[in-house]
Amino acid sequence: MAKDRYVGVVPPIVTPVDKFERVDEAALRGIVRRCKDVGLHGVFVAGSNGECMALTQAERNRAIRIVLDEAGPDYPVMSGVMDSSTQRVIDNIKALEDMGGDVAVVTPVFYARHATQDETVRHFEEILRHTKVKLMIYNIPMFTGLNLTPETIIRIAELDSRVIGCKDTSGNFPGFQKLLRHFKDSDFILHQGSTNLAAASMLLGADGFVPSLAPVFPKVHLKVYQFGKAGNIAETMKWNELLSDVCTLYPMAKSQTSSTKYAMSKVCPMSYRSILPTEPITQSEMAQIDALMD
């Protein structure tokens, strides 16, 4: 059952690259090993934090292939397949199927124009018709231009049992609560994508959250998950105060990915280079992150 496997603290891992913007295989394998070793419940590869749309298609697929291989069959991996048209997403999923992946994370289409709610339902209908893997809905309006309503997410979930869940990074907590009420006691997985809402979401019945800094600060993220899942309000809020401090790291560089990559480089051997045209992290920004981590 998917709900026994794809829940918990599942970070969207960064993609380490060399000066030619090719995936650094050894470093990426090291990130996956760290996630496993510190007790995180799985990984999300080729997400926004993994610079999925900045990588070339070949390098994006290579990153997914490396992560699936390093994770092995027993460690959950969710793979980003988001793209600008339905057929492109289908092609990405077929490549994922060939690599042995079993969960594809799918957003509404984007770039040329913003999709509507109905178009996004049709997007998922067509994907389901032509692919075999499980699908995770990804609501991230800051990048797609469309905030999926709870009603649309419910419609998509009802299309097929292969739609196993939703990662909601909309920041719309009332909408997320509506989903929690609707899917209570079901097998549908609800992941909170906004870390600042993780504690409240866990206490109200979420199945997990997807924080990019979890491999850097695993204990605080796992404690919020564990105590939130157990309904221990006092302990959840105590650990959430520390989590709020951790989250001040995100805006310390001009790009959240740059901040996260630099922080990751302090716990895993890897370059903190971001993909062009992202501005490189500065010495003063690094000093702020060093001070927080020390």
Show the residue positions of the predicted features.
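Charge-dense, low-complexity intrinsically disordered segments
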Residues: 22, 54, 58, 114, ...
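Catalytic cores of TIM-barrel enzymes
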Residues: 2-5, 188, 264
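Catalytic alpha/beta core domains of metabolic enzymes, predominantly
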Residues: 143-244, 250-251
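A general structural signal for well-ordered alpha-helical segments in protein cores
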Residues: 28, 60, 64, 89, ...
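Active-site beta->alpha loop and helix N-cap motifs at the rims of alpha/beta catalytic domains
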Residues: 3-11, 15-147
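C-terminal alpha-helical cap/extension of soluble enzyme domains
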Residues: 8-14, 38-40, 203-206, 213, ...
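Secondary-structure boundary/capping positions in well-ordered alpha/beta enzyme cores
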Residues: 74-75, 134, 163, 186, ...
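Alpha-helical structural signal in soluble globular domains
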Residues: 38, 62, 66-71, 95-99, ...
